[in-house]
Amino acid sequence: MDRLIEAIDNTQNPSVVGLDPTEALVPPRGRGELCREVRDSVESPEEVESAQLAVAYFEYNRTIIDAIADIVPAVKPQIAMYEALGPAGVDIYTMTCEYAAQQGLYVLGDIKRGDIGSTRSRLRHHLNRRGATFDPVA
């Protein structure tokens, strides 16, 4: 927490940028290339599309991180968005967190399970397509 407070003081900005990519947000270009880390996690041809989208998520995140690294103290990647893409998505979540930290940003892992509709939708999508329990208050 001390590091976050210091980062807020240094930037004079208490904002946190959420990194919650969805397929609708990322441009279709660049989905063809798979980086080594992602390629190694793909076990079947069916996972290629998810892996390509995961790489697009990373490029999208990297563009945002590069644009805001001098302006805000922290980013908050929402793990459900990445988990929905399977192993490649989890790898991209990790790569995103590492890249943000390398750029000097404080990384808040948004890994809660009782969350808003878009997160619940992504969790439901990959954990159990028929139903799932979530925060009863949400």
Where are these regions (language model features)?
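Active-site loop-to-helix "anion-binding N-cap" substructures in soluble metabolic enzymes
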Residues: 2-25, 29-138
